[in-house]
């Protein structure tokens, strides 16, 4: 029943405004092709309060961390990582590097088929022209064994630059992403 005009229908939207419960809007999605070593999101609109990347990834060789760069800039990135695997915890820091390094986010190519690393990456104040850009990542992967680099990680980083972010390049230590890899960029209202 339409609340606007009283029309009866099997569709709950007949005569009513569409209902959109999400604060997230899809901007772009990329899927690995087995040969690309970098995936770039370009022409990012400056109309959101922040950005979120949702990642499921696997490398064709080796594994462990996503590298991230903004606007093609190769300087001014600092990252801190805390990771654990159930037996031990590790803390790492990288200062003034050419990338943000986000650990525990890319599954190893030697692991069982269809095992992927998962990560949620939040990019704050991306459209600001007065603030440096901060990033938070929660990631994990598990091969159900005692393999190296499995576990969970919390990473935080900063790009020391006040430019608005209009492109994001994602890599993985120089190796390519498999065809099962997906990166989805969302704008947060």
Residue positions per predicted region:
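Surface-exposed molecular-recognition determinants
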Residues: 2-189
């Amino acid at each position: 029943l339409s609340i606007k005009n009283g029309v009866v229908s099997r569709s709950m939207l007949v005569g009513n405004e569409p209902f959109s419960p999400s604060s997230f809007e899809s901007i772009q999605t990329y899927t690995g092709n087995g040969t690309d070593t970098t995936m770039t999101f370009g022409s990012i609109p400056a109309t959101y309060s922040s950005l979120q990347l949702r990642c499921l990834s696997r490398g064709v060789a080796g594994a462990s961390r996503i590298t991230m760069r903004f606007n093609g800039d190769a300087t001014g990135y600092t990252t801190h990582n805390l990771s654990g695997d159930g037996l031990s915890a590790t803390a790492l820091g990288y200062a003034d590097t050419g990338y943000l390094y986000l650990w525990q986010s890319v599954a190893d190519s030697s692991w069982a088929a269809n095992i992927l690393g998962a990560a949620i990456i939040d990019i704050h104040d991306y459209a600001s022209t007065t603030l440096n850009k901060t990033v938070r990542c929660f990631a994990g992967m598990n091969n159900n064994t005692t393999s190296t680099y499995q576990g969970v990680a919390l990473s935080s980083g900063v790009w020391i630059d006040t430019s608005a972010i209009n492109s994001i390049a994602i890599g993985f230590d120089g190796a390519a992403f498999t065809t099962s890899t997906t990166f989805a960029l969302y704008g947060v209202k």
